Swiss-Prot record:
Location in or out of the cell: Cell inner membrane
Subunit record text: The G.violaceus PSI reaction center is composed of one copy each of PsaA,B,C,D,E,F,L,M and Z, and forms trimeric complexes.
Topology term for the membrane: Peripheral membrane protein
Domain 4Fe-4S ferredoxin-type, residue spans: 2-31, 39-68
Entry's Gene Ontology BP terms: photosynthetic electron transport in photosystem I
One annotated GO molecular function: electron transfer activity
GO annotations of cellular component type: photosystem I; plasma membrane; thylakoid membrane
Organism: Gloeobacter violaceus (strain ATCC 29082 / PCC 7421)
Protein name from the UniProt record: Photosystem I iron-sulfur center
Matches recorded under HAMAP family: PSI_PsaC
EC number per UniProt: 1.97.1.12
Gene name tied to this protein: psaC
Amino-acid positions noted as binding [4Fe-4S] cluster 2 in the UniProt annotation, renumbered to this chain: C21, C48, C51, C54
Keywords for the protein's UniProt record, in alphabetical order: 4Fe-4S, Cell inner membrane, Cell membrane, Electron transport, Iron, Iron-sulfur, Membrane, Metal-binding, Oxidoreductase, Photosynthesis, Photosystem I, Repeat, Transport
Length: 81
């Protein structure tokens, strides 16, 4: 599956998304853009199954993490145009 995972700079470094991911796609890396000093990173997107648990776990109102499903998945779900 080819999904892309985008981490936005609104990430507060809380680690909720990392803990929610059942496949360890995400990890925290050093970053000086928030108080926590870390930001989520997605080094293993090839393992992402598109469950979007990371999005659900994100406590920010603007979803600092988004999973964009690949064309095969959206087609099989009847979401393709």
């Amino acid at each position: 599956m080819s999904h892309s995972v985008k981490i936005y700079d609104t990430c507060i470094g809380c680690t909720q998304c990392v803990r929610a991911c059942p496949l360890d796609v995400l990890e925290m890396v050093p970053w000086d853009g928030n108080k926590a000093g870390t930001i989520a990173s997605s080094p293993r997107t090839e393992d992402c199954v598109g469950c979007k648990r990371c999005e659900t776990a994100c406590p920010t109102d603007f979803l600092s993490i988004r999973v964009y499903l690949g064309a095969e998945t959206t087609r099989s779900m009847g979401l393709a145009y």
